[in-house]
């Protein structure tokens, strides 16, 4: 069997294990729900997981074709491809808060349908654009506009997935489900990076857009038929079956863990509640909330950490195939890219689980130290990849990509959970939207700058910036934690107080957001 088939089967095995665990083996799921409910819930989230994997394919298809052979055939420079990638990231960053608010009004299912149909139309139009051999300048303008629109409408899907899954899962179930759903999301990396070269070689460049566009259109039909906003919309379960008997968990408890003595926790909780009752509560408007966030050094530290982490992650992800193509004696084959794309995908599976396990078991629920260590390790791995990629075997290169993915994606997953636990609750609710916007702004900035740098100075500055950004992400996470330990008590609350803190990112359905 070819490397692409073997890798595809391995990823399908991960997906199957996640599906079976959620439907049959999850202890909390078995405790709270009937088997019929769990299977109906699977029928609800699995189509959204497939659609979100297709979103990733429709987002990173440009990165799959960002190699010299494809660029030269299209007449594109590295700098121009960088601007295409930046347009998509900036569109997502600017629109993120608005798509979330709109989805809250129209409902999760409608938001998901808008995302699927909108991204499908944009990708199919991109396919037509390149199939018709449109004149150069017009083609370049429409490429940027349609790709930006494609990524923008995907923001509706991010909010919709969070909203719908939160209605089907009790707080005590969401942590493990986040890992299961993350397997579905991360498989989209392979659909784009692992199969992109094969699609371009056998069908042509336009079909890296046509295929995800067609898949998303089909998934819109499936979602319209099977997905429901909440269990009560199915009309198949009684009120007794819909009751979630797990008590709501406080975000800090869910994220930090509970490793201390129970009586001590109760005493601490009682003292905090008494302080809240005695203190004067100030209700903050959205404008005042933003000011509080911008004055909070813990938040600013984590915000800068997210900026540098996204610079390293997407700066590497969008250009590593181009780098390998430039420094190796012979271009990567479709089998080679399948190995590399599969290594990145499986590394993402392992990274989120490993980093979380280390923080809980080894570091006793301390999230900051694993992030700091992983940041240093990812800097080392990125430097090693730069120095050995020209001469090492494809198998060794796949191993290095796997390790870099473990550290990069593990870091990203854990950092997205750290913020709500270390910030005061009165300003935590607004933090995640700002962090998502800053992360995608960083991604766009790296695309705009990297393309020009690579055209002018080669890949040495590219690699150096990734290593420096990795180290700085760890440093600023440490600084944010330091200021968190120093901060005084806060008594202000947001008006109105939200029932739960949601983080709108696909990597964190629990907070629920990426």
Which functions belong to the PLM regions below?
Residues 117-136, 376-390:
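C-terminal ends and interior cores of transmembrane alpha-helices
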Residues 59-67, 296-353, 412, 416, ...:
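Extracytoplasmic gate region of multi-pass secondary transporters
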Residues 105-116, 361-375:
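Cytoplasmic membrane-interface "Motif A"-like loop-to-helix N-cap segments
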Residues 146-185:
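Cytoplasmic helix-loop-helix junction between adjacent transmembrane helices
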Residues 366-418:
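C-terminal transmembrane helical hairpin of 12-TM major facilitator-type secondary transporters
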Residues 122, 136-156, 394-410:
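Hydrophobic core of transmembrane alpha-helices in multi-pass small-molecule transporters
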Residues 3-5, 181-232:
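Helix-loop-helix hairpin linking two adjacent transmembrane segments in secondary transporters
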């Amino acid at each position: 069997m070819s490397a692409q088939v073997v890798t595809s089967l391995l990823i399908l095995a991960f997906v199957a294990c996640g599906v079976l665990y959620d439907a049959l083996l999850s202890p909390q799921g078995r405790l709270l729900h009937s088997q019929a409910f769990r299977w109906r819930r699977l029928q609800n989230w699995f189509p959204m997981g497939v659609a979100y994997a297709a979103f990733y394919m429709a987002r990173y298809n440009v990165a799959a074709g960002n190699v010299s052979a494809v660029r030269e055939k299209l007449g594109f420079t590295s700098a121009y491809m960088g601007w295409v990638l930046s347009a998509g990231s900036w569109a997502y960053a600017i629109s993120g808060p608005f798509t979330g608010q709109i989805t809250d009004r129209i409902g999760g299912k409608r938001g998901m349908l808008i995302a699927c149909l909108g991204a499908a139309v944009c990708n199919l139009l991109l396919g037509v654009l390149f199939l018709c051999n449109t004149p150069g300048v017009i083609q370049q303008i429409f490429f940027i506009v349609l790709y930006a629109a494609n990524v923008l409408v995907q923001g509706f899907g991010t909010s919709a997935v969070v909203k719908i899954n939160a209605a089907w899962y009790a707080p005590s179930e969401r942590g493990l489900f986040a890992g299961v759903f993350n397997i579905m999301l991360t498989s989209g990396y392979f659909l784009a990076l692992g199969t992109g070269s094969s699609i371009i070689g056998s069908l042509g460049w336009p079909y890296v857009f046509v295929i995800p566009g067609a898949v998303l259109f089909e998934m819109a039909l499936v979602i319209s038929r099977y997905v429901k906003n909440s269990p009560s919309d199915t009309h198949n379960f009684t009120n007794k079956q819909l009751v979630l008997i797990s008590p709501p968990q406080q975000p800090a408890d869910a994220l930090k863990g509970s490793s201390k003595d129970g009586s001590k926790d109760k005493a601490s909780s009682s003292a905090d509640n008494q302080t809240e009752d005695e203190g004067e509560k100030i209700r903050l408007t959205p404008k005042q909330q933003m000011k509080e966030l911008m004055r909070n050094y813990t938040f600013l530290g984590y915000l800068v950490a997210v900026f540098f982490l996204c610079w390293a992650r997407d700066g590497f992800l969008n250009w590593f195939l181009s780098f390998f193509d430039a420094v190796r004696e012979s271009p990567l084959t479709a089998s080679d890219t399948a190995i590399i794309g599969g290594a990145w995908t499986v590394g993402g599976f392992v990274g989120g689980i490993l980093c979380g396990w280390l923080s809980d078991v080894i570091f006793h629920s301390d999230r900051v130290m694993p992030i700091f260590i992983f940041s240093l390790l990812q800097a080392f791995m990125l430097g090693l990849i730069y120095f050995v990629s020209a001469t090492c075997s494809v198998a060794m290169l796949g191993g290095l990509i796997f390790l870099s993915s473990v550290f990069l994606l593990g870091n990203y997953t854990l950092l997205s959970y750290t913020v709500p636990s270390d910030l005061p609750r009165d300003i935590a609710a607004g933090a995640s939207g700002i962090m998502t916007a800053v992360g995608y702004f960083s991604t766009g900035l790296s695309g705009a700058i990297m393309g020009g740098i690579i055209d002018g100075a080669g890949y040495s500055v590219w690699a150096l910036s990734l290593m420096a950004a990795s180290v700085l992400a760890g440093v600023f996470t440490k600084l944010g934690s330091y200021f968190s330990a120093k901060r005084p008590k806060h008594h202000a609350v947001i008006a109105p107080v939200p029932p739960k803190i949601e983080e709108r990112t696909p990597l964190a359905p629990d907070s629920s957001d990426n």
